[in-house]
Amino acid sequence: MRLTTKGRYAVTAMLDLALHAQNGPVSLADISERQGISLSYLEQLFAKLRRNSLVTSVRGPGGGYQLSRSMAAIQVAEVIDAVNESVDVTRCQGDRGCRSGEVCLTHYLWCDLSHQIHEFLSGISLADLVARSDVQDLVRLQDRRQGGGCPLPYAGKIEASAIE
């Protein structure tokens, strides 16, 4: 699979935004600190996310970013697509020139797998990820490391409607 750090970081940053947006806009500096992603890289990613209408920016004191739709309406595949990332597993990146301009024997197998991966990620929303207990555990750990920063309002599983 050719999913690089660009796609992984975009999904991580969007999940962080979804988890911390209940108190208003989230700054990229806060996401950078919590997730260990450079601020300049986040700025590049969020420019693409904004152009694709996944986030909106709020200027001024207390500004930052917000999801442009509910977290239940944003699919992981959309985030990956927005930053021009691919989940293509073919060697030829979907072109039919696998080898010397010809299709290789397994080309269609890898194309089918790429399609299945994209479909799988299209079926997972940010709300689905927020609701996962392993994500909740990691958020609590990150918040403790940050000195309590912005704890989530519920100790257990968070329903998407609690944050939206």
UniProtKB/Swiss-Prot annotation:
Gene3D superfamilies the record matches: Winged helix-like DNA-binding domain superfamily/Winged helix DNA-binding domain
InterPro entries reported for this sequence: TF_HTH_IscR, TR_Rrf2-type_CS, Tscrpt_reg_Rrf2, WH-like_DNA-bd_sf, WH_DNA-bd_sf
Keywords assigned by UniProt, alphabetized: DNA-binding
Ranges in a coiled coil: none
Single Gene Ontology MF annotation: DNA-binding transcription factor activity
HTH rrf2-type domain: residues covered: 2-131
Record's keyword annotation contains Signal: no
Record GO cellular component, one term: cytosol
Domain of life of the organism encoding this protein: Bacteria
Official protein name in the record: Putative HTH-type transcriptional regulator ORF2
Source organism per UniProt: Azotobacter vinelandii
